[in-house]
Amino acid sequence: MLKSFSKKLFPALAIALIAAPLLGQKPRPASTLRQKPFPSATRGAIEEALGRKGTPSPGGVLRFGFPRGDLQVVKSGITIRPALALGSWVAFQRIGDHAMVMGDLVLLESEVESVMASLQENGVEQTALHNHLLGESPHVMYMHVHAIGNPARIAKAIRTALEFTETPLAASPSAPAAASVDLDTAAIARTIGVHGKVAGGVYQLSVARREKILIEKHEVPPAMGVATGINFQPTGAGKAAITGDFVLIGREVNPVLWELTQAGIQVTAIHSHMIDEQPRLYFMHFWAIDDALKLARGLRAALDRTASKK
């Protein structure tokens, strides 16, 4: 009887095992797929709507910067360069025929209401509105945005919202990037553990996290705003003003805060930038003016308390 049962059972099991992937298996989430760049026509439509060229980044991301060169913001006696803390940006990630868009708009208080209303009317969500710095003059707010849909329409919506600000929107001629700043960038890079780049008179470093970040099952690459950002603006004699934000999960928040404060680095904000991301992320903003290498060591100690790529 067992032999007869086996003859019936094993063919049935074989059919079930073969059919399961075909009938019951869910499609792989986008987080496991390598995202491709936008087709040239789509990229052109995005760039035309925003009025400038984008910068391609890994993960099918096209990123745009809108430096607030119109603002003269001073903190602790330092005039903040746009590349240090005053750069609006938006990033477009290809999701099939659509795009996921994330960004951060640098706004004066007087600009917030009009920009928010414009974005809402055109289908772009706000996921956070807050400070990044403390004690700067004039006071600056940061509005984080998110949308999924037709990339050209989203680009037009963002451009329309920016027209309610004094943000310079005309595409400026490409200027050669500064080859160096008055800092020992090689020593800073060795200390932090990653190489940076010079942009707008500021030495910028980015440190990605080790785990995947997901929104609606889509993997969010570091260029979409989920990497720790560290910026050094030279102030003379080997010193620098630093600011940026650590991207953290909950259990990392207080250990990182401890390391920063022990290094004389002020924590200026702790908050979220997104909604419904996995894992839940917290962003810790910081500020200090001191010897650049001393600050780099403090930042490295804080990074060591995180699951960041080394």
Predicted regions and their residues:
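A conserved regulatory-domain signal marking ACT and ACT-like small-molecule sensing domains
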Residues: 88-91, 133, 141-148, 221, ...
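Bacterial N-terminal signal peptides that target proteins for export
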Residues: 1-12
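Intrinsic, low-complexity N-terminal interaction/targeting segments
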Residues: 75-91, 129, 211-236, 270
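Extended intrinsically disordered, low-complexity coil regions enriched in Ser, Thr, Gly, Ala
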Residues: 81-83, 109-135, 222-225, 250-275
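Second-shell loop/turn segments in exported
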Residues: 30-34, 100-109, 143-148, 174-175, ...
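Hydrophobic, ordered structural segments
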Residues: 107-127, 137-178, 288-309
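Bacterial N-terminal signal peptides
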Residues: 11-21
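Intrinsic disorder/low-complexity detector
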Residues: 26-67, 71-75, 163-208, 212-217, ...
